[in-house]
Amino acid sequence: MQTSNILAKIEAPLFREGIPDFRVGDTVRVHYRIVEGEKERIQVFQGVVLKRHRAGVRSTFTVRKVSFTVGVERMFLLHSPRIDKVEIVSRGVVRRSRLFYLRNLAGKAARVRDAKD
C-alpha cells in the first residue's frame, strides 16, 4: 500500500461535516471551545479571513480582528474538534488569496468591501 492511501484511510474519520464554504475576505464568527481546568466554555472570535490553507484534514485559516485598536490574528485548524461552529457574518469582495496588506492599514482603510447578494 502506498503512503498516501494509508494516510487517506487514517484521516477519513477526522473530517468534520457541516463546515460552511467561506472564502478569504469573508467576515466569520468562530465559536472555539476552551478548556480551563475542569471547566469548558465557548469563546467567540469574529474577524476577517486573511488566508486559507487547504490541506485535507490539516486545513487551516487565519482570522484577524481589531480589538481596542490592537490587531489580533488567530489561526484555526478547520477540522479541529475544539471548533464548535463557524458562522459567516458577511461575504467580502477581494481579488487576492492572501490579505496580508490589511495588517498595515488602520480604520476605514482596513475594511473589506461587502458582496452584493
From Swiss-Prot:
One of its GO terms (molecular function) is structural constituent of ribosome. The keyword Ribosomal protein applies. GO terms for biological process: translation. It holds the Pfam family Ribosomal_L19. Keywords: Ribonucleoprotein, Ribosomal protein. GO terms for cellular component: cytosolic large ribosomal subunit. It comes from the Bacteria. Belongs to the bacterial ribosomal protein bL19 family. This protein is located at the 30S-50S ribosomal subunit interface and may play a role in the structure and function of the aminoacyl-tRNA binding site. NCBIfam families: rplS_bact. This is Large ribosomal subunit protein bL19. It comes from Sorangium cellulosum (strain So ce56).
